[in-house]
Amino acid sequence: MAAKTVKKTRRRKERKNVEHGAAHIKSTFNNSIVTLTDAVGNALSWSSAGALGFRGSRKSTPFAAQMAAETAAKVAMEHGLKSIEVYVKGPGSGREAAIRSLQAAGLEVTLIKDVTPIPHNGCRPPKRRRV
């Protein structure tokens, strides 16, 4: 008896028609992650410097953040996204570059908000680096 081969059919992602959404930019010292969502918060597209193939110290550059924002914007604009609110989190170098890249891609930015979490004297920070 030969084993039956079951062919799995992959479901194509349906094209959502969203005009207004949000861009969440998380920019750390090591990486930049850009997620574009609809108004509710469901992700339309995402990209990061590491996912694009940047490795090591190049991952934390403004250029890497710019490329991540560009690729995420292209996919989201296929879903009909036109205007976004930008929420920026983190102390990284790619914050401004990612916002500029989203505007250059053709998305209208209606709001820019810094949502970096600030502790009310919470955890002890890591010790200073001595190089």
Curated annotation (Swiss-Prot):
Cited Gene3D superfamilies: Ribosomal protein S11
Pfam families registered for this protein in UniProt: Ribosomal_S11
Annotated spans, Disordered: 1-23
Coiled-coil regions, chain positions: none
GO molecular function, one term: structural constituent of ribosome
Comp. bias intervals (Basic residues): 1-15
Keywords annotated in UniProt: Ribonucleoprotein, Ribosomal protein, RNA-binding, rRNA-binding
Any single GO CC term annotated in Swiss-Prot or TrEMBL for this entry: ribosome
Keyword Ribonucleoprotein assigned: yes
UniProt keyword Calcium, yes or no: no
Highest taxon of the lineage: Bacteria
GO biological process: translation
Entry function: Located on the platform of the 30S subunit, it bridges several disparate RNA helices of the 16S rRNA. Forms part of the Shine-Dalgarno cleft in the 70S ribosome.
Subunit-level organization: Part of the 30S ribosomal subunit. Interacts with proteins S7 and S18. Binds to IF-3.
Family: Belongs to the universal ribosomal protein uS11 family.
NCBIfam families documented for this protein: PRK05309.1 (NF003698), uS11_bact (TIGR03632)
Protein name: Small ribosomal subunit protein uS11
The gene coding this protein: rpsK
